[in-house]
Amino acid sequence: MKLPIYLDYSATTPVDPRVAQKMADCLLVDGNFGNPASRSHVFGWKAEEAVENGRRQVAELINADPREIVWTSGATESDNLALKGVAHFYQTKGKHIITSKIEHKAVLDTARQLEREGFEVTYLEPGEDGIVTPAMVEAVLRDDTILVSLMHVNNEVGSINDIAAIGELTRSRGVLFHVDAAQSAGKVEIDLQKLKVDLMSFSAHKVYGPKGIGALYVSRKPRVRLEAIIHGGGHERGMRSGTLPTHQIVGMGEAFAIAKQEMVAENARIKALSDRFFKQVSDLEELYVNGSQTARVPHNLNLSFNYVEGESLLMSLKDIAVSSGSACTSASLEPSYVLRALGRNDELAHSSIRFSFGRFTTEEEVDYAAQKVCEAVNKLRELSPLWDMYKDGVDISKIEWAAH
């Protein structure tokens, strides 16, 4: 076993060697390096063929028509294009958008920007399990609602929203439905022939593909119209201009093809690893699982260790890569906005750690990590006066601390 151990697969994944090989074939002078938009020679034709093959591979994982896949630079851009594209195109129909308080910042910050432009956004509060129910959405739907945007799997706590039921609701009311599937693609089955989802965002680097490439599914039946946010050249049917990065697209296609092939077996393996890890740490007192206990992906295990500061626990686990909060926001010392929205108090939110398991995680790594977590938590609690008080039966929440 090699140290350090990577248990932060929800932040990013390494590129699968099979993917890297396919990408390498598209870079050098004797490879497939042409511009896919060059229509006048074989270099361009070959590149375009590779791009269309990648488009087909992405579409096959989610059972969509390849013509419904638009290449972007990643899920953040896909979210921006979906929200701004719909808002600007359909604003004459209405200016009300619904999302939730625990979306990724790519959706929340875009929603805030749309508010500055005069749109009205309702931010739903999820249940304690991190799930937004169809009833919650129905309660705030209005005649001027044009879009509902909700994630499929939450990036911090791994809970799964019932997008099938929410899609039935939005479709029946004539409201467009966008789903951020960055954390669910390759982990949860997605069938866009059955799901009533109009727009769906994807990222390659969460599925063992390269960073810097993603896609947006844009439904053709019923047809969804978008106003572009990047102009110049009219690539991707005018929805997203810019020379297509053949090697990135080939990488994303191959990554999604591998995911389709291996998803069922891999999910079972990851669940066994996650259960094995949890069993070993579950003897710790005052341990809380964040998010849903049942509707969750096994890849993500978000735990709060009460009376332990999450940052100090991170420091103690120096040869284990895990995170507190999402990678995009974990630089700030604010407690996770996701956990606070789930009703966790600041202490528990501050003591949370996200463990995420993936394709290259081994049993040996999981055992080592679990042992180190138990050692670190016990050691930090020994140093904590709050832990002593808790053990002595003092209800810490009732104490009024004096300021000096």
From Swiss-Prot:
Enzyme Commission code(s) on record: 2.8.1.7
GO biological process, one term: [2Fe-2S] cluster assembly
GO molecular function: 2 iron, 2 sulfur cluster binding; cysteine desulfurase activity; metal ion binding; pyridoxal phosphate binding
TM segment ranges: none
Residues bound to [2Fe-2S] cluster: C328
Keyword Iron: yes
Residues involved in pyridoxal 5'-phosphate binding: A75, T76, N155, Q183, S203, A204, H205, T243
Residue numbers of N6-(pyridoxal phosphate)lysine PTMs: K206
Keywords assigned by UniProt, alphabetized: 2Fe-2S, Cytoplasm, Iron, Iron-sulfur, Metal-binding, Pyridoxal phosphate, Transferase
Listed pathway(s): Cofactor biosynthesis; iron-sulfur cluster biosynthesis
Active site: C328
Cofactor (UniProt): pyridoxal 5'-phosphate
Known catalytic reactions: (sulfur carrier)-H + L-cysteine = (sulfur carrier)-SH + L-alanine
Known partners and oligomeric status: Homodimer. Forms a heterotetramer with IscU, interacts with other sulfur acceptors.
Family per similarity comment: Belongs to the class-V pyridoxal-phosphate-dependent aminotransferase family. NifS/IscS subfamily.
Protein name per its UniProtKB record: Cysteine desulfurase IscS
Gene name linked to the record: iscS
